[in-house]
């Protein structure tokens, strides 16, 4: 995952696309809003490549996979 970096001096250490100040969170929010990869690149971040967006998804998957999730019934 060399396309995603964490630097404590950029966005307070939030994961970003390498070589940019674009956070993984920003990309995930746009995907959640229903935008396609192509729309994100065309309308928001023309310097990104499709592989950068895929890397954001892979990063999120890796985080969730590493969590110890415990469901609690209310």
Residue positions per predicted region:
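Short, Lys/Arg-enriched N-terminal segment that forms or immediately precedes the first helix
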Residues: 1-16
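Long, charge-rich, low-complexity alpha-helical segments
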Residues: 23-74
